[in-house]
Amino acid sequence: GLERVVNALRVIAPELPFEIHFREIQGAQQVFEMDGYRLIAYRVNHNVLCYGYSIEIDRAGKFDAVRAKEQEIPLKYWSRLQKGEQIEENGTCYTPDMVLGAPRKGIKLTYCTDTRPTQSLVENAMHADLLICEGMYGEPGKEEKAVEHKHMTFTEAAEVARKAQVSEMWLTHYSPSLNRPEEYMKTVTDIFPNAYPGKDGKTTELMFEGEAKEAS
């Protein structure tokens, strides 16, 4: 598996400035929880085994100072409760749900290349803030080639974005013969307006609702 491949490569680079933790995917879908992030790996439809990925960051409810005061929760515990900690003091237990409102909308990024349109992709991309999706073929008349090689056309990617109700989509993973993907974006935006051609070095910031966003 992956661990064997990476360890073989480390023969030529034995010293790394970071640790590697191997978590290999088992089955059609698997969820990994790590450091406040949720990574969902799901199988897609290509000529070889491939997975798409969604990264989710949850956002807790807003801290309610009025409720905290009404329940006489010591001020020194407010920040810890806001971070999700449970606190016990002299037989009294303070829990985050005592001072937090309903969970707020978090952040979701979905990334997928090397696949035909699949229901698993639509379901796992649902309501993503950003979908980075393969668009191998932009030119008309490439539908049969897309089916043969198990890739997507621009319009098929646009349909995925529309069905998944994502906020924004970037196309990527173009055919080497596609020199100017922007020339074919009209066929995409007719289906899903908030779509853009991805390019090397393109960046953005995904922010929680109510926070400013910058893109380049």
For each predicted feature, which ranges?
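Active-site HxH/HxHxD metal-binding segment of metal-dependent hydrolases
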Residues: 1-24
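Class I S-adenosyl-L-methionine
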Residues: 7-10, 33, 185-189
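Conserved beta-strand segments of alpha/beta enzyme cores
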Residues: 19-21, 38, 194-196
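Active-site-proximal loop/helix segment associated with metal-binding centers of metalloenzymes
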Residues: 37-111, 115-124, 130-132
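Binuclear metal-ion centers of metallo-dependent hydrolases, dominated by the metallo-beta-lactamase
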Residues: 25-29, 117-216
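Short, well-ordered coil/turn elements that cap or connect secondary structure elements
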Residues: 15-17, 34, 104, 164, ...
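Short "lid" loop at the C-terminus of a central beta-strand within the Rossmann-like core
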Residues: 1, 45, 137-138
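Short coil-to-beta-strand transition motifs
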Residues: 30-36
